[in-house]
């Protein structure tokens, strides 16, 4: 039975195979269902380059070792204090030009690494006594201890003959504040005795405790000259000046430089009196200085003739020479925006050789002021060469002459720029720096004046720091360094200064260090580099300044002034608005 079943199975298999071989159709299996095509992989979205990553990477070129080495060289005795037109000045300029050339920067104007600046040096021989008379009374002020004066004219002789002394308060005309200390009085040929600073007790007048240009000594002498005065004397106090009388002594006793006179009004004598000497002077007129000062605190003030006369004769040794701004250009990558500049500035001059100190040192090396600024800008020049991608706008590295003499080099560049002022995006200026260590803050002199606040604050935040306004607003720092020359022609300026909140230091320590330096070393031979200088904070600050410049160089829009700022009109004029 089993055998029969097996035979039947074989027969069935053979029958099916034969049928297939004879071509009989077989049922087809249904086709598999159509599969949907797999979705295409999304195209990768190109991420824009992180500007902060590029800034951080290039910023590594800014180091403490480089800063120390540069300051050591630029403030060395071999450069003799870098006085304008001296051999030390020439050597300093050559050194800075060589540094820029070695880094691969082109000459600032395409031809030379120097922009010549004509200067007129005046070395005045002032009398040992300056005598004042009122009837039978007289008083003589002693040179150096009681009075300091410089020539206001670029001639071999200067003279004042029987000129009346008139107290003119602050010597300010400010129509925007409804303030006029002169009240239309005829002051031609007079000697104007005036207060330092500007009215600082009312925030609605001027800027309260923040000094404006009206409070600068340069404004005082310019204002007196516009009145036709023969001379001007500023009454010095440390609070009103922001520095002790010794700074006046060392800054004004040597050769004084200026740009060549161009027909502008000038006083014959630009003088200073200590407040004690001024009190004695007005006393011979029966006046109390404190009462005169109080009267000057009111808009209703009118000039006070003192009935005091003075004659003053002096001789000048005239030195017509040359210094120069040193400049180097890094061309931007954008065909259009490369026609615009971001400027980094620092002054290369100091006071040269002057009156010896107690140790006999007569070289005013200017290590902090301003070999440090030059070193910081050279560091930034290095960082821009390391930046990838390169900046869209061009970068101008500018070391200016004659800052200590009244911002002369920057004034010359601002009025003889390599591109029109409307094509200068910003000036980022370095004058002094942090030699005491890391801080939790950074001081921005001019905070609130421009749109540069935003990029600076973002970069500082990334460092874990905050941006503070000028911590010594009564000193008028914005009007005392080279960004002011740019501001006057409308260019937004950024002036960074050391913070005051130092890491691992008690509250108030930073202010103490800054004030101690200004008391003992500012404009003194003792401003020399020291082994204990700590550059960690300076590195942070320089990297901030570098980063702001990168963001400005790559932005589509130019930065501007805050609406209503005193320099907004100049910017609009430069832009043809």
Show where each model-derived region lies.
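Extracellular/luminal Protease-associated
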Residues: 63, 142-262, 266-269, 331, ...
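Acidic/histidine-rich catalytic neighborhood of metal-dependent amide-processing enzymes
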Residues: 209-215, 219, 223, 240, ...
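Catalytic-core environment of secreted peptidases
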Residues: 61-107, 131-133, 186, 190-212, ...
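C-terminal motif of bacterial Sec signal peptides marking the signal peptidase cleavage site
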Residues: 18-21
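Soluble metallo-hydrolase cores and metallopeptidase-like ectodomains found primarily
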Residues: 133-138, 144-184, 263-366, 382, ...
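Noncatalytic luminal/extracellular "stalk/propeptide" segments of secretory-pathway proteins
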Residues: 80-205, 306, 318, 323
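Metal-dependent peptidase/peptidase-like ectodomains
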Residues: 141-146, 157-158, 183, 259-289, ...
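His/Asp/Glu-rich mid-to-C-terminal helical/loop segments that flank catalytic regions of hydrolases
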Residues: 382, 386, 502-571
């Amino acid at each position: 039975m089993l055998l029969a079943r097996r035979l039947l199975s074989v027969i069935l298999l053979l029958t099916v195979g034969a049928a297939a071989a004879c071509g009989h159709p077989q049922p087809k299996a249904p086709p598999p269902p159509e599969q949907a095509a797999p979705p295409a992989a999304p195209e990768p979205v190109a991420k824009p380059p992180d500007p902060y990553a590029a800034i951080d990477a290039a910023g590594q070129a800014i180091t403490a070792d480089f800063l120390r080495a540069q300051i050591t060289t630029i403030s060395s005795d071999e450069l003799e204090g870098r006085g304008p037109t001296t051999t030390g000045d020439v050597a300093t300029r050559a050194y800075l030009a060589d540094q820029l050339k070695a880094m691969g920067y082109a000459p600032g104007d395409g031809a030379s690494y120097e922009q010549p600046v004509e200067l007129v040096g005046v070395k005045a021989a002032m009398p040992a006594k300056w005598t004042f008379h009122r009837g039978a009374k007289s008083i003589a002020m002693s040179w150096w201890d009681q009075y300091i004066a410089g020539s206001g004219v670029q001639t071999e002789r200067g003279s004042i003959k029987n000129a009346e002394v008139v107290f003119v308060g602050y010597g300010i005309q400010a129509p925007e504040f409804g303030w006029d200390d002169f009240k239309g009085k005829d002051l031609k040929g007079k000697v104007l005795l005036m207060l330092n600073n500007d009215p600082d007790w009312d925030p609605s007048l001027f800027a309260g405790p923040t000094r404006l240009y009206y409070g600068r000594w340069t404004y005082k002498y310019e204002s007196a000259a516009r009145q036709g005065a023969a001379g001007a004397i500023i009454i010095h106090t440390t609070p009103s000046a922001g520095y002790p009388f010794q700074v006046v002594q060392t800054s004004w006793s040597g050769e004084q430089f200026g740009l060549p006179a161009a027909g502008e009004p000038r006083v014959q004598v630009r003088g200073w009196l200590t407040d004690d000497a001024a009190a004695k002077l007005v006393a011979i007129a029966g006046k109390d200085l404190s009462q005169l000062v109080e009267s000057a605190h009111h808009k209703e003030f009118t000039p006070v003739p003192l009935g005091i006369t003075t004659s003053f004769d002096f001789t000048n040794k005239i030195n017509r020479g040359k210094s120069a701004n040193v400049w180097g250009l890094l061309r931007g990558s954008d065909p259009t925006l490369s026609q615009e500049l971001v400027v980094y500035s620092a002054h290369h001059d100091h006071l040269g050789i002057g009156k010896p100190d107690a140790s006999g040192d007569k070289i005013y090396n200017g290590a902090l002021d301003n070999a440090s600024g030059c070193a910081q800008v050279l560091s930034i020049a290095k960082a821009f060469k390391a930046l990838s991608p390169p900046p869209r706008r061009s970068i101008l590295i500018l070391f200016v002459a004659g800052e200590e003499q009244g911002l002369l080099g920057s004034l010359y560049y601002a009025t003889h720029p390599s591109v029109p002022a409307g094509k200068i995006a910003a000036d980022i200026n370095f004058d002094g720096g942090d030699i005491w260590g890391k801080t939790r803050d950074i001081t921005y002199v001019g905070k609130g004046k421009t749109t540069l606040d935003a990029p600076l604050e973002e970069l500082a935040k990334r460092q874990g720091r905050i941006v503070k306004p000028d911590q010594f607003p009564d000193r008028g720092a914005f009007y005392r360094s080279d960004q002011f020359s740019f501001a006057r022609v409308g260019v937004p300026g950024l002036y960074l200064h050391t913070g005051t909140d130092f890491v691992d230091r008690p509250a108030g320590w930073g202010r103490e260090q800054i004030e101690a330096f200004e008391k003992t070393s500012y404009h003194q031979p003792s401003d020399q580099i020291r082994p204990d200088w700590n550059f960690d904070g300076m590195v942070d600050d320089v990297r901030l300044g570098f980063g702001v410049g990168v963001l400005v160089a790559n932005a589509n829009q130019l930065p501007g002034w805050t609406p209503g700022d005193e320099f907004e009109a100049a910017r609009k004029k430069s832009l043809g608005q």
